[in-house]
């Protein structure tokens, strides 16, 4: 969720934003290779390239074929051949699987899911701004001894 990531950076004193892959392959059969492509972009292009790729993938959830993923990687200035090679060899499959296992272990069963001071917040919200305010308040409770 790009809106949550950008909001979290504005209150970094209260919280830390950590992204974990949790591709939902039932509704999105191409979600696993998309996550692997994003990890390839991150490994070769850094955090900014990863987030640019993430945002493109989020916007284009219905266009995640290998050729699409390679084109998106090129659009964020990643080397398309490197990403293609990583996808062909499944270079980042284990990384994505570790994230999924970690999520399952923590009770994650869908996206988006957030943890603030050990409490899970999941599902979709009709008012993202109110949800972000709720997360921020929960984060503050943890930093000021209130929770």
Each model region followed by its residue ranges:
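C-terminal cap of thioredoxin/glutaredoxin-like
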Residues: 1-9, 70-147
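Structural alpha/beta surface segment adjacent to cysteine/selenocysteine redox centers
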Residues: 1-74
């Amino acid at each position: 969720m790009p809106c949550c990531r950008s909001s979290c950076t504005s209150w970094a004193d209260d919280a830390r934003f950590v992204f974990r892959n949790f591709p939902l392959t039932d509704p999105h059969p191409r979600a696993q290779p998309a996550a692997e492509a994003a990890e390839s972009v991150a490994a070769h292009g850094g955090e900014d390239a990863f987030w640019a790729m993430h945002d493109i993938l989020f916007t284009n959830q219905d266009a995640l074929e290998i050729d699409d993923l390679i084109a998106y990687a090129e659009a964020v200035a990643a080397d398309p051949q490197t990403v293609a090679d990583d996808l062909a060899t499944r270079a980042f499959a284990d990384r994505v699987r570790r994230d999924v296992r970690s999520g399952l272990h923590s009770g994650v069963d869908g996206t988006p899911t957030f943890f603030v001071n050990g409490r899970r917040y999941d599902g979709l919200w009709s008012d993202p701004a109110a949800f972000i305010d709720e997360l921020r308040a929960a984060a503050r409770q943890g930093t000021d001894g209130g929770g």
